[in-house]
């Protein structure tokens, strides 16, 4: 069994390639989920102000007794707070019971309002102040990313986007890579595997490797060079999703899964969403 892999971000910081997402988890259930995840081997946890569970995440980390330098904690700036990122991050840190986060992300560009460049400039300052180690974005399209780079000279280290076998976003993934922006997949299993887990190629690979369809899809993300954050609060599934280090998909198998792409977006359109 190989060890969990880490990715080196373009600012030099290291990020676990596989983490636990906690979207929709309540403050109480997230505590047991994180404790289970830590026991299994996860060290990266992805939350957000909008998830309203940062307090639970903070309680879980505080009570777990794991050294802070072993953890990689991500949270996100919500749309309504794009004019007050400094205050928003300090509120998040208070709930998380942390002095800093490892990664702070702008949750959505909200281009119709047009504050994301100013918000990004504030994140640059927050990084300089040591309140976040790295800074990035979620759901940014190429024009949004290009504008950040053109106007501030600083590229995000991460662009976290909806990405799964039915929505592979290969052009955006490639653009990110060209600009040394690491792509991170949210909803990596296409919201519980609907339309993915029943695909013939996924079943064939699951049989071949003695794995579940979810493990095959997570391994596809890893072998495609993506950071991936499957969400679960179910102990057995948390463990299952992390048990992916003893096999790899070969090139032909990655190509076969690539053919499942339908451009099927399950979440909001980043050009329209104003949340």
Per-segment meaning from a language model:
Residues 1-71, 122, 189-190, 256, ...:
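N-terminal binding-site loop/beta-alpha segment at the start of enzyme catalytic domains
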Residues 44, 100-103, 134, 158:
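Residues at the N-termini of beta-strands
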Residues 68-81, 103-109, 163:
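A short, structured active-site edge motif that brings together acidic residues
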Residues 109-275:
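Beta/alpha (TIM)-barrel catalytic core signal, keyed to glycine-rich beta->alpha loops juxtaposed to Asp/Glu
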Residues 2-7, 55, 59-62, 88-92, ...:
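Alpha-helical scaffolding within the catalytic cores
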Residues 25-28, 46-56, 78-85, 111-114, ...:
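Acidic-and-aromatic substrate-binding clefts and catalytic sites of carbohydrate-active enzymes
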Residues 86-106, 125-129, 150-151:
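CE4/NodB-like, metal-dependent polysaccharide N-deacetylase domain
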Residues 25-37, 81-97, 143-146, 167-168:
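Short, acidic/polar
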């Amino acid at each position: 069994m190989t060890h969990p892999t880490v990715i080196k971000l373009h600012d030099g910081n290291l990020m676990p390639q596989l983490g636990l997402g906690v979207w929709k988890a309540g403050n109480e259930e997230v505590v047991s989920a994180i404790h289970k995840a830590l026991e299994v081997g996860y060290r990266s946890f992805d939350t957000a102000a909008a998830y309203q569970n940062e307090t639970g995440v903070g309680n879980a980390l505080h009570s777990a007794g794991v050294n802070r330098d072993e953890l990689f904690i991500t949270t996100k700036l919500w749309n309504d707070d794009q004019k007050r990122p400094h205050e928003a991050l300090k509120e998040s840190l208070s709930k998380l019971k942390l002095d800093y986060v490892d990664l702070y992300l702008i949750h959505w560009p909200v281009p119709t309002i047009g504050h994301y460049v100013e918000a990004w400039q504030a994140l640059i300052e927050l990084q300089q102040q040591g309140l976040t180690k790295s800074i990035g974005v979620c759901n940014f399209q190429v024009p949004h990313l290009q504008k950040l780079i053109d106007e501030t000279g600083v590229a995000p280290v991460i662009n976290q986007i909806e990405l799964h076998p039915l929505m592979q976003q290969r052009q955006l993934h490639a653009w990110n890579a060209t600009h040394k922006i690491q792509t991170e997949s949210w909803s990596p299993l296409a919201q519980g595997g609907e339309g993915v887990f029943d695909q013939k190629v996924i079943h064939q690979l699951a049989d071949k490797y003695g794995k579940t369809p979810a493990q095959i899809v997570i391994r596809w993300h890893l072998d495609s060079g993506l950071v991936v954050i499957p969400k679960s609060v179910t102990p057995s599934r948390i463990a299952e999703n992390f048990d992916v280090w003893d096999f790899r998909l070969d090139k032909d198998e990655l190509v076969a899964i690539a053919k499942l792409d339908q451009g099927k977006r399950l979440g909001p359109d980043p050009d329209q969403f104003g949340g």
